[in-house]
């Protein structure tokens, strides 16, 4: 086999490995120190959500694959919100939607800004096959990907600054409606889970 014929032969096996990796790391609580660090840094819900976005982007860069980021970092951001934020079910749903948006959008569009990401490698391979007269590098693709810069930048900045309220149906619930659980409540919840 050669060329386009063998292009996807390894994808299913890789996705199974990535899914297993995310599940195993979650069961081992391997990322608990990372969650603890995020909670120490976050002073309010908006900062927590911004840090969830940064986690998604950092996970995408570290793992160099958007699906690996979704199955590995996705459960971390989900647990951060579920275990540390209190509010009405409707408001918590808004936070869950933002986490899903971070996982998806920062996975796909964030990958377009990471030079060592598998997407960029894939595109470079196609470009080199189609036009072999030029030696393409990752920055040839990244510097013209204005949409990725806008999506990643606006998602993070609108979340952090609160300017997301100007985008219809995109605003996060404000602080009195949702708030971080007090540290005493968190230690009680953890001791109940352990018992």
Annotated model-derived regions:
Residues 15-18, 38-80, 103-104:
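Hydrophobic alpha-helical transmembrane segments of multi-pass integral membrane proteins
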Residues 36, 67-82, 114-131:
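Re-entrant/interfacial helical elements at transmembrane boundaries that shape
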Residues 1-32, 53, 57-58, 62:
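Core transmembrane alpha-helical segments of multi-pass membrane transporters/permeases
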Residues 110-195:
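Juxtamembrane and boundary regions of transmembrane helices in multi-pass small-molecule transporters
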Residues 25-33, 38, 42, 67, ...:
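Membrane-interfacial segments
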Residues 15, 47-60, 86-113, 133-150:
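Alpha-helical transmembrane segments of multi-pass membrane proteins
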Residues 27-48, 133, 177-188, 192:
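Cytoplasmic juxtamembrane regions at transmembrane-helix boundaries
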Residues 27-31, 42-45, 79-99, 126-138, ...:
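Juxtamembrane helix-boundary/capping and inter-helix hinge elements in multi-pass membrane proteins
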């Amino acid at each position: 086999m050669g060329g386009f014929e063998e292009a996807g032969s390894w994808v299913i096996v890789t996705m199974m490995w990535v899914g297993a990796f995310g599940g195993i790391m979650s069961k081992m609580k391997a990322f608990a120190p990372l969650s603890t660090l995020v909670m120490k840094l976050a002073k309010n819900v908006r900062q927590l959500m911004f840090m969830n976005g940064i986690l998604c982007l950092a996970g995408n860069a570290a793992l160099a694959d958007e699906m690996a980021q979704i199955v590995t970092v996705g459960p971390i951001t989900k647990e951060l919100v579920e275990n540390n934020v209190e509010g009405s079910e409707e408001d918590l749903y808004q936070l869950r939607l933002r986490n899903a948006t971070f996982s998806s959008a920062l996975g796909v569009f964030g990958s377009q800004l990471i030079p060592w990401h598998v997407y960029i490698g894939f595109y470079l391979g196609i470009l080199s096959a189609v036009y072999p007269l030029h030696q393409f590098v990752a920055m040839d693709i990244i510097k013209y990907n204005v949409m990725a810069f806008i999506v990643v930048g606006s998602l993070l900045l609108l979340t952090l600054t609160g300017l997301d309220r100007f985008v219809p149906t995109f605003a996060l619930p404000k602080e009195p409606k949702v708030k971080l659980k007090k540290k005493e409540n968190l230690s009680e919840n953890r001791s109940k889970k352990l018992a």
